[in-house]
């Protein structure tokens, strides 16, 4: 799959507009997601659309919301959601529009990330959607000490300018 460092619009399926993920998206943002290069794809592997459609265990569990074509014109699955559960899959990176600004030594961007206001709006919408989904979960920590121990702020952030990620967290395998 040739979809590395590749920003493209989503090819929405007929299911997208009524999906949980996209149904509350403002129409103007839905149009942006479907027509502007606001989704960064950064992968060599994925699920081909024909494989998804031919595999009952996938197409009976997941609703296909969008597809895309790699540089060679091969169609792949780009957004899915479970029919029944709050399980989602995005082959694109909605988090990067807001937060990844890595540059090469010559000052050029390391990745083809769109940082336009429209791309940032898509990132913010997606983040807010997932926060709202997480709030539906009734799992809680036993106490505030247990919760505090699990926070990301307990781990140092490492600046990694030579990487495509500006910052990284290195977590100990102690949980």
Predicted features and spans:
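Amide-donor transfer/coupling interface in amidating biosynthetic enzymes
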Residues: 1-175
């Amino acid at each position: 799959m040739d979809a590395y460092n590749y920003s493209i619009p989503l090819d929405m399926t007929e299911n997208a507009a009524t999906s949980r993920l996209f149904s509350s998206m403002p129409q103007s943002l839905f149009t942006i997601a479907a027509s502007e290069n606001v989704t960064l794809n950064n992968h060599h592997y994925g699920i081909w659309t024909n494989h998804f459609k031919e595999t009952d265990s996938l197409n009976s569990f997941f609703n296909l919301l969008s597809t895309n074509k790699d540089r060679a014109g091969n169609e792949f699955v780009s957004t899915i959601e479970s029919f029944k559960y709050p399980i989602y899959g995005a082959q694109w990176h909605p988090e990067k529009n807001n937060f990844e600004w890595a540059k090469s030594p010559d000052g050029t961007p390391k990745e083809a990330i769109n940082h336009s206001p429209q791309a940032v709006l898509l990132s913010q919408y997606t983040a807010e959607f997932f926060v709202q989904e997480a709030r539906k979960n009734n799992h809680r920590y036993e106490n505030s000490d247990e919760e505090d121990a699990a926070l990301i702020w307990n781990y140092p952030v490492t600046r990694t300018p030579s990487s495509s990620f500006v910052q990284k967290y290195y977590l100990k395998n102690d949980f």
